[in-house]
């Protein structure tokens, strides 16, 4: 601050000192230096030079001032002032405002005299003009200095725009729902309602117009048609609200960051394999390599491989894979290649130079391909060596016997290959952790096949890494999209969506399928139509692979935002208007009551102990409660309480390995909730459907994620026999669930958390194998009608014609509109329809009988793992034929209908033209069956168009016997016709 009587700077108004010794004209130091820099050395008031002494007062008029800590004259030489001005100018160029320099207050002595003022031509004093120009220039200087400082501190415009965009993206949703257009969905729903009405009118006509001359045929057809109508309702209405979803991976990165300091959640990958001779180690290795190379922070990825066959071949091939990953992973990340499974990357028939501008790419790619070929040679050598097992068993490289020589009786084995303490890649970077796991097996213990292996991986991973999310893959499903994990995290880590999400399911996509997809291996209708419909309800079903789980959901917990239970429970959605007098307890409440009784008994026993602290008692009871659910492992129990995952920093790695061996022991799950309420659920060979159903019953919802580039791809059995056995396994699992306590028809009503349309979809999932019974009967009806001359419908009236046409038109229009909103092709739809009939009259029928026999007689069905394709020729496996009894029923139906068509035409030729009209309806019916079974017929012919002799003999024999018996018995001839014939025979005409 200035002292009293000292005026401020005449240019800028800041603290000033006397620049002119003659007239004491007040200027601040910055303005004085600015004048000096511009070459103005004369006073604006008196015209004298700055620093010149006043002739009246001499040298003593100015008192020395203190500037910072040194004493210097008020007016220094011009050279010194120019130097200071240039320094200030340099500071301004660097973006530092010159006015930030602080100065001490200066004491100016009073001046006794002031020089005369000089005027310009207009009569205005010159000093005033100069003061005004100073002020204007000062303002300009300040403005430019501020701009320079802002420019120096701010990033470039492009970066600033990107930063602002990232900041905005960080607060935006990570995904969004894209509803189907109303122009597509409204007509679709309207036609469904119309079809339902027409179906009711059709059934009314069919029931009220029996065919008395063929009453048995008519009754059979009506029962079959009613079942088909019921099956259509179960399949159709869960597709009422289909939706699409879109993810924003860039927003995920903006919110949680990337690299070492990323806030992305860790993920544990599970890969399961059993028999390396049927599941080639090279296929499993490609899956593992694609996981290790995913586009995700390496310290947040762990890969666990479950070897349920305890094969040394799997162990050794995994060791080779870990070594090859040191070269493969940095190559993938350096050039951002897709897919990151080397077998499928190098076999692509595309221009691999597209979008690759790095000059060394071609050279490194060629070298990497050579390394991979050498790696394949080593793996194939291991496979060739494993074809013949030594009598003394396998010996490891250190000379000790392989612990898993007996796959049914061996200890648990764990080996960590890569990770934080393991080998690094050739660029010196850390690699994701790779862990080999083979759970303990002993005679007399139930191991629960794949479900038991997955639960063992859940416990091992919880002890070693405890990532909050788990992504499981079959050994033949590789990561096709390196950003697949980020796609899943867009749902899981979105606060507005992920709280109630138990899993994110990706669609299955396949390689190596023939172009026409003869046996509907792609299953496009299910993955692109049904699953989208379920996503609009409570979420898609779990299909066993390509699924990212929330670990806490696998532990049997409900969603965090679970609403309060209703006051009363209902037995079914259809009887909600008839409430019970007393609400039944839900399963969770009954489980809680039983647990409370156990705890009370435990408390009673503890109270008998003298001097037992209450706090210690409560802690012990809590520990006992967790042990009853999760097993006897304090480390694992502690991990279940960590919702965000992670392992305690104080944990000793060697101790954790010992604990991991303990949790995969064969008796660990005894007297616990594993397989009942926790983990993968036991009780069916299709544990995936059962596990997802239990989660949905607890109130969780699931998400269906369909990225533009498929997340995962796998292989499918493309030959007829293997495909039918795969369908047989799925159908048997559904029958097992239908006959168990977890049947959706009666399970899970207590909490009321399963939406009724979602329940319909689960009912359809477990009921569809039983459609094989009416389907086989219906497929035999055309041949029977042609052989007997009867038909299942009477002569059509005008009204009946309208109902039939209305039903056929509604079926066609519904299918067309479904294709329209889903985007699938008509060929995929037709292949699905064909294989629905093929599977229904073969695999589904066997599944029904096997499931019933298993329940009644306790006969367990052992399924072998489907062998993966090994034929080097394109689609070579398509023509491989393997004999199986499943082929007999559809072959018999084919032969029977062909015989019926021939017999029908022969009868029409003998009977005259009046019988041709009814014949066309019967022949059309038979041709409908033959057209649906045509892919099956091609599969029987094989590459050489030859059907195996045994199949031909059995089918012709059955069809011939059936036809002869039918013609001999002729059970559908009316009694009146018989009486007339007998009377005529006794009358002598």
Swiss-Prot record:
Disulfide bonds: none
Superkingdom in the source lineage: Eukaryota
Subcellular location field: Cell membrane
GO molecular-function term, one example from the UniProt record: cellulose synthase (UDP-forming) activity
EC number: 2.4.1.12
Gene: CESA4
Protein name: Cellulose synthase A catalytic subunit 4 [UDP-forming]
Binding locations of Zn(2+) 2: 20, 23, 43, 46
Organism name: Oryza sativa subsp. indica (Rice)
């Amino acid at each position: 601050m200035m002292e009293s009587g000292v005026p401020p700077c005449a240019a800028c108004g800041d603290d000033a000192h006397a620049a002119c010794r003659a007239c004491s004209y007040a200027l601040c130091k910055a303005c004085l230096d600015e004048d000096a820099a511009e070459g103005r050395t004369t006073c604006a008031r008196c015209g004298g030079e700055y620093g010149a002494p006043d002739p009246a007062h001499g040298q003593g008029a100015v008192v020395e001032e203190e500037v910072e800590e040194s004493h210097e004259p008020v007016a220094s030489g011009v050279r010194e002032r120019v130097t200071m001005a240039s320094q200030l100018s340099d500071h301004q160029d660097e973006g530092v405002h010159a006015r930030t320099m602080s100065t001490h207050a200066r004491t100016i002595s009073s001046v006794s005299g002031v020089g005369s003022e000089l005027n310009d031509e207009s009569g205005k004093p010159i000093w005033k003009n100069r003061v005004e120009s100073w002020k204007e220039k000062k303002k300009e200087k300040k403005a430019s200095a501020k701009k320079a400082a802002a420019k120096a501190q701010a990033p470039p415009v492009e970066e600033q725009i990107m930063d602002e965009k990232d900041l905005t993206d960080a607060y935006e949703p990570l995904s969004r729902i894209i509803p189907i257009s109303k122009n597509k969905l409204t007509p679709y729903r309207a036609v469904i309602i119309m079809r339902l009405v027409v179906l009711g009118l059709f059934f009314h006509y069919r029931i009220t117009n029996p065919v008395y001359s063929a009453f048995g045929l008519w009754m059979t057809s009506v029962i079959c048609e009613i079942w088909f109508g019921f099956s259509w309702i179960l399949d159709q209405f869960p597709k009422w609200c289909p939706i699409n979803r879109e993810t924003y991976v860039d927003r995920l990165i903006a919110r949680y960051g990337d690299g070492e300091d990323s806030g992305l959640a860790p993920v544990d990958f599970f890969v399961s394999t059993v028999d390396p001779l049927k599941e080639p180690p090279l296929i499993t290795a490609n899956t593992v390599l694609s996981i290790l190379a995913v586009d995700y922070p390496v310290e947040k990825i762990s890969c666990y491989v479950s070897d349920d066959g305890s094969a040394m071949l799997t162990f050794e091939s995994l060791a080779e894979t870990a070594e090859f990953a040191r070269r493969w992973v940095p190559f993938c990340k350096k050039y951002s290649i897709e897919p990151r499974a080397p077998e499928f990357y190098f076999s692509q028939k595309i221009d691999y130079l597209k979008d690759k501008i790095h000059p060394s790419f071609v050279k490194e790619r060629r070298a990497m391909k050579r390394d991979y070929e050498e790696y394949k040679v080593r793996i194939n050598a291991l496979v060739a060596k494993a074809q013949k097992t030594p009598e003394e068993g396998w010996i490891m490289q250190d000379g000790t016997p392989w612990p898993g020589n007996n796959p049914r009786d061996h200890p648990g084995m764990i080996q960590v290959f890569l990770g934080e303490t393991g080998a690094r890649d050739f660029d010196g970077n850390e690699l994701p952790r790779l862990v080999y796991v083979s759970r303990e097996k002993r005679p007399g213990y139930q191991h629960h096949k794949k479900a038991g292996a997955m639960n063992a991986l859940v416990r091992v991973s919880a002890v070693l890494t405890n990532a909050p999310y788990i992504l499981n893959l079959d050994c033949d499903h590789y990561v096709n999209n390196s950003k697949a994990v980020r796609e899943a995290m867009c749902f899981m880590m979105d606060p507005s969506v992920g709280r109630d999400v138990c899993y994110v399911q990706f669609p299955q996509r396949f390689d190596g399928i023939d172009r026409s997809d003869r046996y509907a291996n792609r299953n496009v209708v299910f993955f692109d139509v049904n699953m989208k419909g379920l996503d609009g309800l409570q979420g898609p079903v779990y299909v066993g692979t390509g699924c990212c789980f929330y670990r806490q959901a696998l532990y049997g917990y409900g969603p965090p935002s679970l609403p309060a239970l209703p006051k009363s429970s209902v037995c079914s959605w259809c009887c909600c208007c008839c409430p019970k007098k007393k609400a039944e307890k839900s399963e969770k409440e009954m489980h809680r009551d039983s647990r409370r009784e156990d705890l009370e008994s435990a408390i009673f026993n503890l109270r008998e102990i003298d001097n037992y602290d209450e706090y210690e008692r409560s802690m012990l009871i809590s520990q006992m409660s967790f042990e009853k659910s999760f097993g006897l492992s304090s480390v694992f129990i502690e991990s279940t309480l960590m919702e965000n995952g992670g392992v305690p920093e104080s944990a000793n790695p060697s101790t954790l390995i010992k604990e991991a061996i303990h949790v995969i022991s064969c008796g660990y799950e005894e007297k616990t909730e594993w397989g009942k309420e926790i983990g993968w659920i036991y009780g069916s060979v299709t544990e995936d459907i059962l596990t997802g159903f239990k989660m949905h019953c607890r109130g969780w919802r699931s998400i269906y994620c369909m990225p533009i580039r498929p997340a995962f791809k796998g292989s499918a059995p493309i030959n007829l026999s293997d495909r039918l056995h795969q369908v047989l396994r799925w159908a048997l699992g559904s029958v097992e669930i239908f006959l168990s306590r977890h049947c959706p028809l009666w399970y899970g009503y207590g909490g009321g958390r399963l939406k009724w349309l979602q329940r319909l979809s689960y009912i359809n999932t477990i009921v569809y194998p039983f459609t094989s019974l009416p389907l086989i009967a219906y497929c035999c009806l055309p041949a029977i009608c042609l052989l007997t001359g009867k038909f299942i419908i009477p002569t059509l009236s005008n009204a009946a014609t309208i109902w039939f046409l209305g039903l056929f038109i509604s079926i066609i229009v519904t299918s067309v509109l479904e294709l329209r909103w889903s985007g699938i092709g008509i060929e995929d739809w037709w292949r699905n329809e064909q294989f629905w009939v093929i599977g229904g009259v073969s695999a589904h029928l066997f599944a029904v009988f096997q499931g019933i026999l298993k329940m009644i007689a306790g006969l367990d069905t052992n399924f072998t793992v489907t062998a993966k394709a090994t034929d080097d020729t394109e689609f070579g496996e398509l023509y491989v034929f393997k004999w199986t009894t499943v082929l007999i029923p559809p072959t018999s139906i084919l032969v029977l209908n062909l015989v019926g068509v021939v017999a029908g035409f022969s009868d029409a030729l003998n009977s005259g033209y009046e019988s041709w009209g009814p014949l066309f309806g019967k022949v059309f019916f038979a041709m409908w069956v033959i057209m649906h079974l045509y892919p099956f017929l091609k599969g029987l012919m094989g590459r050489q168009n030859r059907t195996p002799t045994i199949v031909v003999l059995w089918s012709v024999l059955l069809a011939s016997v059936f036809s002869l018996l039918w013609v001999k018995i002729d059970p559908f001839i009316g009694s009146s016709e018989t009486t007339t014939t007998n009377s005529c025979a006794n009358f002598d005409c």
